[in-house]
Amino acid sequence: MLNQKIQNPNPDELMIEVDLCYELDPYELKLDEMIEAEPEPEMIEGLPASDALTPADRYLELFEHVQSAKIFPDSKTFPDCAPKMDPLDILIRYRKVRRHRDFDLRKFVENHFWLPEVYSSEYVSDPQNSLKEHIDQLWPVLTREPQDHIPWSSLLALPQSYIVPGGRFSETYYWDSYFTMLGLAESGREDLLKCMADNFAWMIENYGHIPNGNRTYYLSRSQPPVFALMVELFEEDGVRGARRYLDHLKMEYAFWMDGAESLIPNQAYRHVVRMPDGSLLNRYWDDRDTPRDESWLEDVETAKHSGRPPNEVYRDLRAGAASGWDYSSRWLRDTGRLASIRTTQFIPIDLNAFLFKLESAIANISALKGEKETEALFRQKASARRDAVNRYLWDDENGIYRDYDWRREQLALFSAAAIVPLYVGMANHEQADRLANAVRSRLLTPGGILASEYETGEQWDKPNGWAPLQWMAIQGFKMYGDDLLGDEIARNWLKTVNQFYLEQHKLIEKYHIADGVPREGGGGEYPLQDGFGWTNGVVRRLIGLYGEP
């Protein structure tokens, strides 16, 4: 094993340290025998030319200088800035003055860019409000109206109003929005539901998929594919008929399955992996293999300590962001070290459950429209996926779903992602019963269910609990007849959120729930955010079902 640091001997240049604490995995020696047909990075079909460049692409060495110098505490701040003039003119000016003795990078940025608008100070919580009243009054605070696209800004304009999570997140996010919508429906905000439905359909039409969020730097990846669940919600709440979205669902499916038909066993392309028996399963992916604009310095530091080619690490970090679980022991080879991330080598249980739902939704809506051939085709696809999941991702010995390391050909860790097959109706009753026992003994706490069993310092691990996981567990177990467990999780979670609200008068992104004393969840690449979209949505829906805690 190598363990050394390489330092630049020239003191006038930037010091470079590379941690080579890396031992070649014997399984990786086999990779040359596997053909992974990776696409060229930065190839995004259907992307309008005016929005093709991310801030890192547009500002080149200026972008790297700003991020490396840490002139903003949050790496996301500069990518969210909008230029006051043509970016090319800014870059030319920067190149002319950057070596001047009195050059001030912070002043240069402030003179040439509009800093992101901060909304958090606009709202002061009323301690007299109940939890329900607090959430209902927050919807307008978290709503952003459509606006003209500021030239060369990273923010992608949307045609209708939308909800943002809150805090540092001033754009809409794909899978967050579904859980936010649950609360909007409960609050009677059908107007916002319609707007968000139109926005997501518009993004599919214009970009061929729903990006991670409405920023140029998010266009190279998506997030957990929950549009089929959104469509189901629209239908249930009378917002929009499901039939009108059939073409959009098919387009999203094509995005996730791109390249599948040309793969041979043990081959992967973008999101698709052909398993040894010829079946198809999916993984998370990002078409770029560069540091994320919004976490540029953090990614560079992580890659520096990996001992692997940086582009591989960047791809896995980006794919981890696409998973929504950024980050978790689920994606780490060494659970205590983010630099060991291997997201693209895992077949995630939640992703494949969501795609099962997508296939089933296309089949169901096709049946409503009398498209029998399409219905039959997608019923077969859903059935084939369920069979493949049971072969590769179901741990029969322990009665749990687990992710699958397709390169090592072995099961990976157990986490709360295992409840998604129940939420989408993919499990059988025996699997649901056995999984319930595992969740009770391994993930359930007096505060809700943990993201995982492992304490790694990452935010999607123990001791944290997250609203979307609670909702899917509650509804998933109740769908299979385990009302006792579903209701217990619901009561525990409502108690957690309400107790914290009574003390702090706010809802937050994640909660520390391991010891029965609710407090702020830790971990992650950024400070804890309050607001918070999907917590508000899930809790508001639960209040409608269970009453105020």
Swiss-Prot record:
<dbReference type="Pfam" id="PF01204">
    <property type="entry name" value="Trehalase"/>
</dbReference>
<comment type="function">
    <text>Hydrolyzes trehalose to glucose. Could be involved, in cells returning to low osmolarity conditions, in the utilization of the accumulated cytoplasmic trehalose, which was synthesized in response to high osmolarity.</text>
</comment>
<feature type="binding site">
    <location>
        <position position="324"/>
    </location>
    <ligand>
        <name>substrate</name>
    </ligand>
</feature>
<feature type="binding site">
    <location>
        <position position="168"/>
    </location>
    <ligand>
        <name>substrate</name>
    </ligand>
</feature>
<comment type="pathway">
    <text>Glycan degradation; trehalose degradation; D-glucose from alpha,alpha-trehalose: step 1/1.</text>
</comment>
<dbReference type="InterPro" id="IPR018232">
    <property type="entry name" value="Glyco_hydro_37_CS"/>
</dbReference>
<feature type="binding site">
    <location>
        <begin position="221"/>
        <end position="223"/>
    </location>
    <ligand>
        <name>substrate</name>
    </ligand>
</feature>
<dbReference type="InterPro" id="IPR001661">
    <property type="entry name" value="Glyco_hydro_37"/>
</dbReference>
<dbReference type="GO" id="GO:0071474">
    <property type="term" value="P:cellular hyperosmotic response"/>
</dbReference>
<keyword id="KW-0326">Glycosidase</keyword>
<dbReference type="InterPro" id="IPR012341">
    <property type="entry name" value="6hp_glycosidase-like_sf"/>
</dbReference>
<dbReference type="GO" id="GO:0005737">
    <property type="term" value="C:cytoplasm"/>
</dbReference>
<feature type="binding site">
    <location>
        <begin position="175"/>
        <end position="176"/>
    </location>
    <ligand>
        <name>substrate</name>
    </ligand>
</feature>
<feature type="binding site">
    <location>
        <begin position="292"/>
        <end position="294"/>
    </location>
    <ligand>
        <name>substrate</name>
    </ligand>
</feature>
<keyword id="KW-0378">Hydrolase</keyword>
<comment type="similarity">
    <text>Belongs to the glycosyl hydrolase 37 family.</text>
</comment>
<feature type="binding site">
    <location>
        <position position="212"/>
    </location>
    <ligand>
        <name>substrate</name>
    </ligand>
</feature>
<dbReference type="InterPro" id="IPR008928">
    <property type="entry name" value="6-hairpin_glycosidase_sf"/>
</dbReference>
<feature type="active site" description="Proton donor/acceptor">
    <location>
        <position position="326"/>
    </location>
</feature>
<protein>
    <recommendedName>
        <fullName>Cytoplasmic trehalase</fullName>
        <ecNumber>3.2.1.28</ecNumber>
    </recommendedName>
</protein>
<dbReference type="GO" id="GO:0004555">
    <property type="term" value="F:alpha,alpha-trehalase activity"/>
</dbReference>
<dbReference type="InterPro" id="IPR023715">
    <property type="entry name" value="Cyt_trehalase"/>
</dbReference>
<comment type="subunit">
    <text>Monomer.</text>
</comment>
<dbReference type="GO" id="GO:0005993">
    <property type="term" value="P:trehalose catabolic process"/>
</dbReference>
<keyword id="KW-0963">Cytoplasm</keyword>
<feature type="binding site">
    <location>
        <position position="525"/>
    </location>
    <ligand>
        <name>substrate</name>
    </ligand>
</feature>
<feature type="active site" description="Proton donor/acceptor">
    <location>
        <position position="509"/>
    </location>
</feature>
